[in-house]
Amino acid sequence: MSHQHILTLFNLLPVATNISTWWNFGSMLLTCSIIQMTTGFFLAIHYTANTNLAFSSVIHILRDIPNGWCLQNLHSIGASMFFICIYIHIARGLYFGSYMNKKVWMSGILLLTILMATSFFGYVLPWGQMSFWAATVITNLLTAVPYLGTNLTIWLWGGFAINDPTLTRFFALHFILPFMIMSTSSIHIILLHEEGSSNPLGTNSDIDKIPFHPYHSYKDLFMLTLLLFTMMSIMSFSPDMFNDSENFSKANPMMTPQHIKPEWYFLFAYGILRSIPNKLGGTLALLLSIMILLLPPFTHTSHIRSMTFRPMAQFLFWTMITTFVILTWAASKPVESPYITISQMASTMYFLFFIINPLLGWMENKILNTNH
């Protein structure tokens, strides 16, 4: 069989000539999924979902299993890389108006939600101090639900406190959810190829398309090499870069860490949660910080799809990215002044982006119509 026939699948996929490096993160996310599922499977073989043995089983993987340290660190760093890629992927969608392809965008938000749940359950599994207390704080938010809250929390915990049943079910969920991620990813990709991907100009690219292979496949391969190189470098030189030092101690329900916080990739949402002094209000704001991403396809007002030719929208977008970084930083700090005020201001700025952006689009349309 000729080289051409083997790659028919890729050759039959027409892609816009001008898609930039920002379009490579989808394939990088798929690679992250494969790495996570492979390393996760081998870790699950040696892991014990028991409150007395979980922490010891992780130490056993690191010390006694051949290349166990490599598996564990790859899985841990891979999770951070997964979130870096998905946040860039979402930011690209917001900047270039990819959200106008509604079905793809909605399936993407569903994917993000499942991924966040998966990583939260995974963070609890080592049963370190921060694992235990982060799980306690986050699951406790369910008690904010009126009438049903307490019953829901007890049902989730499998008892009146976080204990063995909680860890067992979290392990089961952490194992099963990646299969949901893979199936939802397939739907996401199928829906994308129904219409085709957008391009940096936000124009219709039907008149100017080239085969995916070899033009874009090599570009993808280059970014994948960079991703793997970054992961291997962190694993070799600074494997605990993304870890919390509290998690090197076994979970102790009798001793609370000085500053409870989730993994770095949840800090922006945690910052929004913390900035509201009311429990129910904070929980709603936490949910809204993700669910608000469902709005842009319905609130897009500008005649121009992409922000490439919209300088004011670009300024607004980069303000939002800065806000995201500030929220992440402030949430990693103790709950004291000035961090409380900074978190509150940044949270307001974060939500304002989704309100100001459509107004800005409407204003741009007015200016363009006036000039005509």
From Swiss-Prot:
PROSITE patterns: CYTB_CTER (PS51003), CYTB_NTER (PS51002). Its cofactor is heme b. Pfam families: Cytochrom_B_C (PF00032), Cytochrome_B (PF00033). Coiled coil: none annotated. One of its GO terms (biological process) is mitochondrial electron transport, ubiquinol to cytochrome c. Its main location: mitochondrion. A ubiquinone binds at H193. The chain crosses the membrane at residues 25-45, 69-90, 105-125, 170-190, 218-238, 280-300, 312-332, 339-358. One of its GO terms (molecular function) is ubiquinol-cytochrome-c reductase activity. Heme b b562 binds at H75, H174. It comes from the Eukaryota. One of its GO terms (cellular component) is mitochondrial inner membrane. It is found in: Mitochondrion inner membrane. Component of the ubiquinol-cytochrome c reductase complex (complex III or cytochrome b-c1 complex) that is part of the mitochondrial respiratory chain. The b-c1 complex mediates electron transfer from ubiquinol to cytochrome c. Contributes to the generation of a proton gradient across the mitochondrial membrane that is then used for ATP synthesis. Belongs to the cytochrome b family. PANTHER family: CYTOCHROME B. The cytochrome bc1 complex contains 3 respiratory subunits (MT-CYB, CYC1 and UQCRFS1), 2 core proteins (UQCRC1 and UQCRC2) and probably 6 low-molecular weight proteins. Heme 1 (or BL or b562) is low-potential and absorbs at about 562 nm, and heme 2 (or BH or b566) is high-potential and absorbs at about 566 nm. This is Cytochrome b. It comes from Acrochordus granulatus (Rasp-skinned water snake). The gene is MT-CYB.
